[in-house]
């Protein structure tokens, strides 16, 4: 079981910090629990292990590895990030599932009032849920290529190295709250060594 705290990048359904959630989950279950959310360095790994997790799960740190297939500009934006936001803007097929992202043109356009997104966009996202798993991949790929910050129907696909460049401004740049503490792109094997307590 993975206890994912609110600090995590990507889809975040709760509002409890990683360490607090880990404590609650461990008290409720008898199976091993892994911890995720906001862990980017050896100290973070050590903290969750000392709190009883059997392992740490690090998404954003490995997004910024040489082996990651994330779009190069997505990686660059992560390294330059000063903040993250919780939004429901990129929720086609994922209604009611806020996601933590780095701001881009789409978030600047549609999150002007500090909310998680306009109510009508969130309502449209709820309506798409039954269709999301039934839409053929070929249609989803075409939709991604046409996605623009000015169009309010924004899907959950992050920019990849083989995807359209436009997704860097119109797609979700998923990143954990502590992305601001990451300063380099390293080989995954080197990261594993550096993260091991």
Residue ranges and their predicted role:
Residues 2-3, 57:
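Conserved beta-strand positions in the central sheet of alpha/beta enzyme cores
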Residues 8-11, 16-34, 40-197:
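Conserved active-site-proximal phosphate/metal-binding subdomains
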């Amino acid at each position: 079981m993975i206890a994912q705290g609110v600090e995590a990048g990507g889809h975040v359904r709760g509002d409890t910090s990683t360490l607090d959630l880990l404590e609650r989950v461990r008290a409720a279950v008898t199976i091993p629990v892994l911890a995720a959310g906001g862990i980017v360095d050896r100290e973070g790994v050590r903290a969750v292990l000392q709190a009883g997790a059997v392992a740490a799960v690090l998404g954003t740190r490995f997004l910024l590895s040489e082996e990651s297939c994330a779009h190069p500009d997505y990686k660059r934006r992560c390294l330059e990030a000063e903040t993250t936001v919780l939004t429901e803007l990129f929720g086609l097929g994922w209604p009611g599932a806020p996601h933590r992202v780095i701001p881009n043109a789409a978030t600047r356009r549609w999150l002007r009032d500090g909310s998680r997104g306009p109510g009508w966009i969130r309502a449209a996202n709820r309506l798409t849920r039954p269709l999301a798993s039934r839409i053929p991949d070929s249609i989803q790929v075409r939709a991604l290529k046409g996605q623009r910050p000015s169009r309010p129907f924004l899907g959950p696909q992050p920019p990849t190295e083989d995807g359209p460049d436009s997704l860097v401004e119109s797609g979700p740049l998923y990143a954990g709250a502590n992305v601001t503490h990451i300063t380099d792109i390293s080989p995954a094997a080197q990261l594993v060594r550096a993260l091991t307590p």
